[in-house]
Regions:
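A conserved beta-strand-loop-helix scaffold within acyl/acetyltransferase catalytic domains
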Residues: 5-55, 59-70, 119-254
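Short alpha-helical functional segments enriched in proximate histidine and acidic residues
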Residues: 22, 104, 270
Length: 317
């Protein structure tokens, strides 16, 4: 009997339960793909997420948004890419899914897809079927950002510089712990981004507090204090088996006391027990063409090594 052809549908709110149930059991999904996370910024991104069916069976999801005639996967998330099930799915089905999606997008006036591939550390089981499908559709690599990651199963030791930073923090009476001082931290973060980059955090304080209330176990703030004064902190997203550093900031005194390595050491020792990787995040600007070498060296000094976040462009002909 011939397999049924792939059918593409756009996500709408009536699909919410079906979407979330698929995310729960997929081999490369996380809380980032739950609608309770994706929909918090629906006012910023015109959702154009796709659902691929084989007959009546849902076989893949693509979190995505549309801007003009371009489809992005997804600009409001840490990374993009097709979400795939563990069973009854393979590269042959992925090729059929991509073919069907391209036909669907072309019919709706979309001429380009920007596909932000998911780094392999976020897979709970091998899930690179999409990369081969991109190749088959002539995808062009347009962005390559370097992140720095620790394998928490066998972490490398901090180098002399990082150890010295931790010792400095301890010598100055800095205490590190999980914190609920989100408002104080957001003030530090906002001031830092304004002074260094004339920018603001991607999330407002209200948005982050909302997400924290929805995902209390997956979103945590680890902070350094001295005599009750908040000196710095790191917001960690627990994404499957990965601890991802979402925000890092400190006060001038916090930098002087070198609190950031001390916080990371605490995270590795305490929060990292049930995770496989700690991902420090990317160190690039200008779509990967500029590498902040000093920042990379600091992360490598804490035991991190490189992975890449790649983005591809498909011209839909």
């Amino acid at each position: 009997m011939r397999e049924e052809v792939i059918r593409i549908e756009r996500y709408n709110p009536c699909h919410r339960r079906e979407w979330d149930e698929f995310v729960e059991t997929a081999k490369n999904s996380s809380f980032l793909h739950r609608r309770a996370y994706m929909d918090y910024h629906s006012h910023r991104f015109a959702d154009y997420s796709l659902m691929a069916y084989q007959g009546e069976r849902l076989v893949a999801l693509l979190p995505a948004n549309r801007e003009g005639n371009v489809l992005y996967s997804h600009r409001g998330l840490t990374y993009g890419g097709w979400i795939m099930p563990l069973r009854h799915f393979n590269v042959v089905v992925m090729l059929q899914v991509m073919d069907a999606a391209v036909s669907y997008l072309k019919a709706d006036g979309i001429s380009e897809m920007e596909y932000r591939a998911m780094p392999h550390i976020y897979h709970s089981y091998p899930a690179e079927e999409d990369l081969y499908a991109l190749f088959r559709h002539g995808a062009e690599l347009t962005v390559s950002n370097v992140s720095t990651t620790i394998d928490l199963r066998c972490p490398l030791h901090f180098n002399t510089g990082a150890k010295s930073s931790v010792a400095c923090a301890r010598k100055n009476g800095v205490v590190v712990a999980e914190s609920d001082r989100w408002a104080d931290y957001w003030q530090i973060l906002s001031q830092l981004l304004k002074e260094r980059y004339d920018a603001t955090p991607v999330h407002s304080l209200e948005e982050m507090q909302l997400l924290k209330s929805r995902f209390p176990e997956q979103i945590r703030l680890y902070a350094a204090e001295k005599d009750g004064e908040l000196l710095g902190g790191i917001v960690i997203y627990s994404i499957g088996g990965v601890l991802h550093s979402q925000y890092t900031a400190a006060t001038p005194q916090g930098w002087q006391y070198r609190v950031i390595p001390a916080i990371y050491q605490y995270i590795i020792a305490n929060a990292g027990k049930d995770s496989r990787y700690l991902d420090f995040g990317i160190s690039n600007e200008d779509r990967g063409r500029y590498l902040n070498e000093g920042l990379v060296l600091q992360k490598c000094g804490m035991g991190g090594r490189a992975i890449v976040y790649n983005t591809y462009k498909i011209t839909l002909r």
